[in-house]
Amino acid sequence: MTTDLTDRRRLILKLAIQEFIESSQPVASDLLVRKYRLNVSPATVRNELAALEELGYLTHLHTSAGRVPTDAGYRYFVENLMDRTPLSATEQRTIRHQFYQVRSELDQWIQLAGAVLARTAQNASVVTPPRAQQARLKHLELIAIHETTALMVLVLHDGTIRQQTLTLDVAMTQEELSRCAAQINERCCDAPVERIEEVLKQERAQEPPGGNALVCQVLDLVVKAMHQFNEHISSDIHSDGLIEILNQPEFSRVERVRRMVEILQSGRALGTLIPRALSSSGVQVVIGGEHSYDEMREYSVVLSRYGGGEIVGVLGVIGPTRMAYPRAISAVRYISAVMSDLLAELYGIEGANRLNSEP
């Protein structure tokens, strides 16, 4: 929605959304006039609230005369109205100190990021470990075990090692296996899975019919392993902060608590958002009905990638659409910058979200 609003309507919409975020109660015109000392009458504010409702930014509950924001209202607020306030200097120092105390322990980074995000944003948090954005083949070895059995050792660009036993159609010597591995390494080194699929297709089209059977068999297993790795990137999600989100009034009903626990534990719906964050720069905000999964349409997610180059991860917060967006965005932005700096300093990875570039 791109409707231009008058300055007065922008102010009233901003105040109405801020008030609802703070109180969780529908917002009435007389409250806005009294609390924010507006130089207009409650009747005038009431008319403006009605106009904003007609435009789709607000709605009202049948049991109350007050208004509440719609997803479109929250979107307009995030993009045009909210105050962008960074975390305080004290908070930044504390967070940075906590991370540098555990900077040599990657697993502790992930746990700490989840805990700090949840506490700072007062919502649940999600974090994925830093990984290659997409699996690339670094090296392949084939090791003879028995005449018709071999071990495939697959090394990916980020150092991940996959091993799998192959049952061969015919007996093979170590020399023959090594030649096959060398051929694949020459053609597929540093290649993503899409390129290896092309090589497999080309090999199958060669003479004799089906090409080199061993090469095709190995390439097929490589493709499957790399697809599994890429899928794992989107599903390896650490979550924290359930206790924080349960303090929100939206979770007074058991059924809603159950749905949130399922979202955090299964990772299926959240996993669909990870590729979007990995391929985007800056902080991404997905609000309510903008989600493709129905079970996510009562929630908002604030995400950012961290790291840089080939090695990146994603972190963010999830909560009800009545989220303190400025606070959540500031927390996600700052912590992603801290983790990018850690990756850059400790592993020689140039961070995309550096602290010195934060606005």
From Swiss-Prot:
One GO molecular-function entry: DNA binding
Gene Ontology biological-process annotations: negative regulation of DNA-templated transcription
Alphabetical UniProt keywords: Repressor, Stress response, Transcription, Transcription regulation
Highest taxon, organism lineage: Bacteria
Chloroplast listed as a keyword: no
Family in the record: Belongs to the HrcA family.
Cited function: Negative regulator of class I heat shock genes (grpE-dnaK-dnaJ and groELS operons). Prevents heat-shock induction of these operons.
Protein's name according to its UniProt entry: Heat-inducible transcription repressor HrcA
